[in-house]
Amino acid sequence: MASTDDNKPPTASDFAKDAEPQFDPTARTRNWFSILLGTMPPSHQILYREDQYARHEKRDCDKCEEWRDYNLKYSPIVIFMQKNIRDLNGKLDADNIRCRRCPTRITEDGKMVRQGGGFSPEHGIQLCANEMRDSKHVEDTLAHEMVHAWDHLRWKVDWGDLRHAACSEIRAASLSGECRWTREFWTRNNYRVTQQHQECVRRRAVKSVLARPWCKDDVQAVKVVNEVWDSCYSDTRPFDEIYK
């Protein structure tokens, strides 16, 4: 599962803390100025964002499909992964790579979970159109989910096993390009140079494992990622080395 960038969203507990009136999605001008001036409470920011995503769903999906089609035709990493998936008797193309709006999910302990995409062995890849910023973001997300698809075809991954899931998350974060230095620097404000790639991969793998409903807490997520780290981070198949 491809996570969105690492800024922590408000939790559901913010809803209880806010003594503001009920959010009114029809008060567009007032809401816009509240966002602009920084006076909108966190709980209303969540509702405002989800309302905007719903309003612009068609526009977002159309743009996402345009970026998807471009990458399927021109992206070296996407074309490479498509070929290697075909070599394992799999198929990923515009028919089973779909752009959809992905609402924020609230976990049992009240955390807000957003995602950039997902892979299902039965259905293919879903790109979260409301989370995609540009064609490069779609490329990274496609590459991430295609690594999951390749892993599933190659090793018959048991996605209910956290160790299996953690290994694939490590590989997907490492090989997709989402942890390259420029993306860390410009979109996540992480300015470290030494060990930057490893730290990014570990952080994002832990976050993805933690987002799975059957992961108990961050302690378990870190433990599982650490258990499989050495073998999974060093495994760059189907690439000869980390591509970018």
From Swiss-Prot:
InterPro entries assigned: Peptidase_M76_ATP23
Highest taxon above the source species: Eukaryota
Region Disordered, annotated ranges: 1-22
One example of a Gene Ontology biological process annotation: mitochondrial protein processing
PROSITE patterns: ZINC_PROTEASE
Pfam families the UniProt entry points to: Peptidase_M76 (PF09768)
GO MF term (any one): metalloendopeptidase activity
Localization: Mitochondrion inner membrane
Record's keyword terms, sorted: Hydrolase, Membrane, Metal-binding, Metalloprotease, Mitochondrion, Mitochondrion inner membrane, Protease
Active-site annotation: E145
Keyword Glycoprotein: no
Main EC class the enzyme belongs to: hydrolase
EC number: 3.4.24.-
GO CC aspect terms: mitochondrial inner membrane
Functional description taken from the UniProt entry: Has a dual role in the assembly of mitochondrial ATPase. Acts as a protease that removes N-terminal residues of mitochondrial ATPase CF(0) subunit 6 at the intermembrane space side. Also involved in the correct assembly of the membrane-embedded ATPase CF(0) particle, probably mediating association of subunit 6 with the subunit 9 ring.
Family: Belongs to the peptidase M76 family.
Name of the featured protein: Mitochondrial inner membrane protease atp23
The organism of origin for this protein: Sclerotinia sclerotiorum (strain ATCC 18683 / 1980 / Ss-1) (White mold)
